[in-house]
């Protein structure tokens, strides 16, 4: 398995939830599906709550925000999200001072990380009390750490030419992207996305949790060969880390 060597630790909690530790030792979460996540290792259900500084939210589907409100209340972590999700979270009892809402193209600094919100082509709704609630639009993030290491989390999305622009503008070292198919891009689309982005490393996510998510890291690697992509694919199992 690759060693990043950049003093940033990235752990797959399961499905689309990731835990990152910054060079300063700050802990951040990308999406928050923990307690009911069928592939989350039991020790991580407590560990994600330890010294949690921030939670970055890509969109409002249950498999990305099921534990968001509880974690924010318990830990006091700053919640970073697309602007139109803020009123819903305030209504759930998260103080305005704990919320950082912004939009595509904007950049904020939270927990020593400069985060730029990017486009993701996906929906962002939840179903509560017999109603569909719109929680803004889906997003991705470019996360730039204090030592220059840069991670691009695409969010749930299909492949898009925006990824080429992001690759040219931000030169991400590592990409986190979905490969499961059905609700997001499949391994072949993801391989083409990696061709557009040009990062050194990639971590696949959002596959295998349910039978309908049929994409595999092996298929991603195969299609990377098809497109001449040299990005190294790091296939983490839930609970595994790379640093």
UniProtKB/Swiss-Prot annotation:
Question: Which InterPro entries does the record cross-reference, listed alphabetically?
Answer: Metallo-B-lactamas (IPR001279), RibonucZ/Hydroxyglut_hydro (IPR036866), UPF0173 (IPR022877), UPF0173_UPF0282_UlaG_hydrolase (IPR050114)
Recorded GO MF terms: hydrolase activity
Q: Which domain of life is it from?
A: Bacteria
Q: Which UniProt keywords apply?
A: Hydrolase
Classification via HAMAP family: UPF0173
Q: Which family does it belong to?
A: Belongs to the UPF0173 family.
Name the chain's protein.
UPF0173 metal-dependent hydrolase Caur_2542
Q: Which organism is it from?
A: Chloroflexus aurantiacus (strain ATCC 29366 / DSM 635 / J-10-fl)
